[in-house]
Amino acid sequence: MKKLVSFVLLTATLLGVLSCNRGPRKALLPNVSGKAGEIIVVIDRDNWEGNLGNAVRDILAGDCPYLAQKEALFTIANVTPTGFADLFKVHRNILIFNIDPQGQEEGVIYRNDVWAHPQCVIQVNAFDNDGALRIMNENADRIANAVEQAERDRIIANAKLYEEVNLAKIVTEMVGGSPHFPSGYKLKKRTDNFIWIADEKQYTNQGIFIYKYPAAEAENFTQESIIAHRNAFLKENVPGMFDNTWMTTSDFVAPTVEFIRFRGLQFAQTRGFWEVHNDFMGGPFVSHSFYGQGANDVIVMDAWVYAPRYDKRQYLRQVESLLYSFEWAKPAE
């Protein structure tokens, strides 16, 4: 892939830390508590209200990208070390600051399933407050990615547990692999090169488009190429409610592209806003574009949300996580 906008590499070490394989011990653990996207931060009150707490909020509660209204990346709450009782130990995501002048080593420890399952526990060890602030800032991306991956893994595990297997078969027939679609998702449209699958509720709509086109261009993964193909497919296949209306990509805020390698698959991730031409509907989208097997086609999985009455962070995180569940079909034995 050319013209790298940015590159994100989730290391094998981090993925191993965040894996959710249930072993004998995990089977005995209680289920996690808390709402999706929540993090409990175990730190004393003075540090929470000072520079260290500000750093935590900047890193974990900054604005979630490409949402029309401001929403925090995660919802964070403070618990003091003395108040960190059993009730809080079973929370889904926990960030613990262990500040001890007599400690043996500074750094960050990533663990899962310490007190519950599936749980993400991150511990920052430091000799003093300044050291804790430095370590937090130095490991900002990795800490945020660890929590994001833990949230993503829970969604994917649920999708696999309650999977609509027939949808995966349909997608695999067209592109050679498929995400895992949980119960509630239905097939809306299918052509030779375009599939529309959605979970439609009364006031929300979470959809995924899967489409492909020949990899004939020198710059298949530039923003211009990705958006041009996206708009062409949407105009042809996704009409609006009224005549002369269709879904397209909003240019009010320019989409961004970054290249990601995740569990062996390299893809261009595009974030932006969709809208309906000649109408007033819109919302966020995120897409993954990558070469098909043999590199003859470009495959695009495009996840989007319509939820005008509600915050959209969790709706988008849910449908985006399904893109990360994509797997190539295993060869027939």
Can you name each region flagged by the protein language model?
Residues 133-157, 179, 185, 297-333:
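Surface-exposed amphipathic alpha-helical segments
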Residues 74-126, 130, 237-295, 310:
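Signature of long, low-cysteine stretches enriched in small and polar/charged residues
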Residues 16-19:
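C-terminal motif of bacterial Sec signal peptides marking the signal peptidase cleavage site
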Residues 134, 146-215:
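Acidic/His-rich structured neighborhood in mature extracellular/periplasmic domains
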Residues 1-8:
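Bacterial N-terminal signal peptides that target proteins for export
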Residues 23-118:
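Start-of-domain marker
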Residues 120-128, 207-212, 297-308:
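Short, well-ordered beta-strand elements
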Residues 25-26, 33, 42-46, 182-241, ...:
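Secretory pathway targeting signatures of secreted, lumenal, and periplasmic proteins
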